[in-house]
Amino acid sequence: MSEFSRRSFLKTACISVGALYAGCNNPVSPKQDASAPKLPYCDVLVIGSGGAGLRAAVAARKANPNLSVVVATKMMPSRNATCMAEGGINGVTDFENGDSYKLHAYDTIKGGAYLCDQDAVEKFCEAAGKVIYEMDYLGTLFSRNEKTGGVAQRMMGGASKRRCNYAADKTGHILMHSCLDDAISNGVKFLMDHELLDIGVMDGKCEGVVIRDIQTGGIYPLLCKSLIIATGGYTRIFYNRTSTPFIATGDGVAAALRAGLGFEDPEMIQFHPTGVKNGGTLITEAARGEGGYLINNKGERFMQKYHEKAELAPRDVVARAMEIEIREGRGFGEGLGAYVLCDVRHLGKETIMKKLPKIRHTAMLFENVDLVDEPVPVRPTAHYSMGGVEVAQFDDMSTKIAGIFVGGEAGCISIHGANRLGGNSLTDAVVTGKLAGLGAANYAKGVANFTDGAKTHELAQQWQAKFKEVTSGGGSVNEMYALREELGKQNWDNMGIFRTQSKLDLLAKNLDEIEAKYKQIRVPNPNEVMNTAFTDYVELGNLILLSKCACLAAQKRLESRGAHTREDYPKRDDEKFLKHSIVTMNDKNELQLSYKDVVVTEFSLDGRKPQ
């Protein structure tokens, strides 16, 4: 980088940070007059600052610039799972190669093992093609096709055509900064270092949330006319081995469940085939999309015997194949340290440096391996939540509770079914995030006045009392962190890639014991300021709750479908289980399981391509 460009970069970065912090000044209660409520408030509140949250916030502001739109986030807006999505963003823009929106929908539905709601998928795939042009126009620095000058595309697992648009292997990072710049430019306000505790609902309508300022420790009600949940997934239930950030603890999903919304398909959790051996950080699918091989200890490209698309088979197929190789003695190492190899050396240094620079850095950082010279050890890692808050309709991402909307991985509409295709997650974030923002803005416009916030204020008082209870008395934070590690191990051992009834029954028993221990835990630090141990305590409670939901649904789904592989029920059973699992919580805080039918339109269940 030249001296001039470095200076320009730093200048731009400083301007962006300054603008962001300017957006943090007085973000709530934008006007004070006789009609304003006594409690803090904003018109549209977005929880979560990933791609979905920022797209939602911008869409709401553009739909109605008079609305006050606030994004609450546990960390800096740029610290999220969107930044970690490396491979690309799906969307059909090249129709000359035989691709179409319908073919994208077919691949998505087939890859999702037909648990996708087909009406939603068709709308999603049409919107996906259009959003690529929108993000390109916004200034997203995509890699370019050297022949046409258009956005460059690569193959991804389960795809019939090249439709994954990319920016080297940093697509999510680049996309995230485009969305953040757009949000700042459009007057979106930010509450950084704030965590969601609960959602207040009165008479079937959202009245606000209980939120905690991590910096000061203040726990208070925040009223809003409409709420957008964009908190991402819950794969941190596999705490010891996941590719997602530490903040991906399903806070929004857990709060929605307690507020009365359904948790749809919680058992459907994707294991990405290639996480680094130590910890599970992602080696992007772009490595295989560019032609990388998976190699066992015999030096064989083993994927060719499992699927016709070899390394580019759907993720659930590749993950299972890798685990089978390891279980049958053709892997390297032992136990949780076992692995196979991902080899891209044959691509050459120039291609690796141009198209895969980030994963080269990741391999060096976590495994001390240079991909130019040697393969990197990999093993499946918990990566994506197909399940999420039950969404009522795709067009505005609304829920059954008036005023609550959901965007991105936190929701389940169900676009991804039982297994998400690579490249569809970023598309999901930008498409459903925008729809949620438009829906929330439209709803807020029709709400004349804020409620008095009685329910939300009551919940805030309960959480204030909870803080005092948990942070007083004896105990040790080490007990809490040991319990968190145990939760991750139990989930991985018994609800991982291969599941059985006996394993799931054992997990249910162990989760009850973990929950009982959690209720006795104390975090002996009454200091309210930057008490991150209490933040970890809240997150652990959410992870335990969501683990129990996933286990319950997995116990009762007596089939194998997508990411849900039952060794004791190895076949897909459309007659009994072409249904979505819906977990709800009753007034006694007991979990209940019900089902609803999958929406089937023109795509047959036998794998035939549409005409």
Regions found by a protein language model. Give the residues of each.
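Glycine- and aromatic-enriched mobile tails/lids
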Residues: 33, 40, 51, 56-59, ...
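Glycine-rich loop(s) and the adjacent beta-strand/alpha-helix scaffold that form part
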Residues: 226-281, 422-439
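Core beta-strand elements of the Rossmann-like FAD/NAD(P) dinucleotide-binding domain
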Residues: 40-42, 217-226
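N-terminal secretory signal peptides and thylakoid transit peptides that target proteins
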Residues: 1-17
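Conserved redox-cofactor binding core of oxidoreductases
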Residues: 134-218, 230, 272-279, 294
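An anion/pyrophosphate-binding glycine-rich loop and adjacent beta-alpha core
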Residues: 255, 261-377, 439-445, 485
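Glycine-rich active-site loop/strand segments that organize a redox cofactor
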Residues: 91-124
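C-terminal segment of N-terminal export signals and the immediately downstream linker at the start
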Residues: 23-51
